[in-house]
């Protein structure tokens, strides 16, 4: 499990609700000059994004980076596919894992680390409605227990 470090620019909160995250990977992302300026300004949306392995490379799809305002002719298509940078060993492992039924790669966070944009992608399996209700119920029970403990320890 890789933990995101650095300045978090965007998060995909819906991914943790809709998917069970089994493993996470930190990947670099290939961006143009105006795209990185938009990312630094936190003008990126991960909500509908997903990644896939094609020809031994990982590609990020449906991630919207708003065009940079001062970029005029240098701006790219906001919804274009972008290449993710991972080690060959990681790509091979992901390719094998994705062949399983119901598995997908979803972007969880975009953050800046040492001046470079990084994407935290998660190997995920879709949740059913009853799984979502169960996780909400578990979270509520944990909150109640913490509230009770805090109230008890406060006396």
Curated annotation (Swiss-Prot):
Keywords: Cytoplasm, RNA-binding. It is found in: Cytoplasm. GO terms for molecular function: RNA binding. The keyword RNA-binding applies. It comes from the Bacteria. Residues 132-147 have a biased composition (Basic and acidic residues). InterPro entries: SmpB, SsrA-bd_prot, SsrA-bd_prot_CS. Required for rescue of stalled ribosomes mediated by trans-translation. Binds to transfer-messenger RNA (tmRNA), required for stable association of tmRNA with ribosomes. tmRNA and SmpB together mimic tRNA shape, replacing the anticodon stem-loop with SmpB. tmRNA is encoded by the ssrA gene; the 2 termini fold to resemble tRNA(Ala) and it encodes a 'tag peptide', a short internal open reading frame. During trans-translation Ala-aminoacylated tmRNA acts like a tRNA, entering the A-site of stalled ribosomes, displacing the stalled mRNA. NCBIfam families: PRK05422.1, smpB. This is SsrA-binding protein. It comes from Streptococcus mutans serotype c (strain ATCC 700610 / UA159). The lineage of its organism: Bacteria, Bacillati, Bacillota, Bacilli, Lactobacillales. The gene is smpB.
